């Protein structure tokens, strides 16, 4: 009873064989769109199970979001380790409040992904992309084309309804937030073969 069990994974289900990402056979991540390597939820979203006797209520559920960087500070807090020092700043935040039901660290928080390289086979959401999630909204920016997609994840978890044209203000806000973050962390981005110049940041195209 003094053991904490955490079950999770690092990405969506693998479906990289030709035809698996965009055909009827692609169902293992339902209702999420696409799979591993995709910027869509099917590539970045995973369920998690935590067993912690006396802390996590058995059978309870939580629909809040977090990211893998959050596990480091959370596990240290679980172990009761305080006042520790790290070589670099910690990117994650502890999700202990979610486990205890005392708060929600995702409120007002943005999560970022940057995949500037070509990965595996083609398919929905596959290719050099960067994206940001804030609250209900998720913005995906395609480096190769400059295209942006906006989804309300709460209402459209399958990401089938791109509402970027209906909400240009949200697209602009999230593009700015994403571009600012990528510059801050010196994020990589592709370059044009013809000129060797880097493609625009998401907030340089509207």
Predicted features along the sequence, with ranges:
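Intrinsically disordered, low-complexity polar regions and short flexible loop motifs
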Residues: 156
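Short, flexible loop/turn segments with low-complexity composition
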Residues: 7, 88-89, 186-198
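Short acidic capping loops at alpha-helix termini that bridge into adjacent secondary structure
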Residues: 1-3
């Amino acid at each position: 009873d003094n053991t904490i069990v955490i079950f999770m994974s690092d990405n969506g289900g693998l479906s990289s064989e030709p035809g698996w990402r965009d055909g009827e056979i692609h169902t293992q991540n339902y209702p999420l769109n696409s799979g591993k390597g995709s910027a869509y939820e099917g590539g970045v979203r995973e369920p998690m199970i935590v067993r912690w006797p006396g802390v996590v209520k058995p059978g309870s559920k939580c629909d809040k979001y977090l990211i893998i960087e959050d596990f480091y500070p959370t596990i240290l807090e679980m172990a009761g380790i305080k006042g520790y020092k790290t070589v670099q700043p910690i990117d994650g935040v502890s999700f202990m409040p979610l486990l205890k039901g005392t708060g929600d660290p995702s409120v007002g928080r943005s999560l970022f992904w940057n995949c500037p390289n070509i990965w595996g086979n083609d398919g929905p959401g596959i290719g050099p992309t960067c994206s940001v999630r804030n609250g209900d909204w998720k913005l995906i920016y395609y480096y190769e084309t400059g295209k942006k997609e906006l989804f309300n994840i709460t209402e459209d978890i399958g990401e089938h309804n791109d509402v970027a044209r209906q909400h240009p203000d949200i697209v602009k806000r999230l593009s700015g937030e994403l571009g600012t973050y990528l510059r801050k962390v010196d994020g990589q981005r592709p370059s044009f073969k013809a000129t060797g110049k880097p493609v625009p940041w998401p907030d340089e195209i509207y």
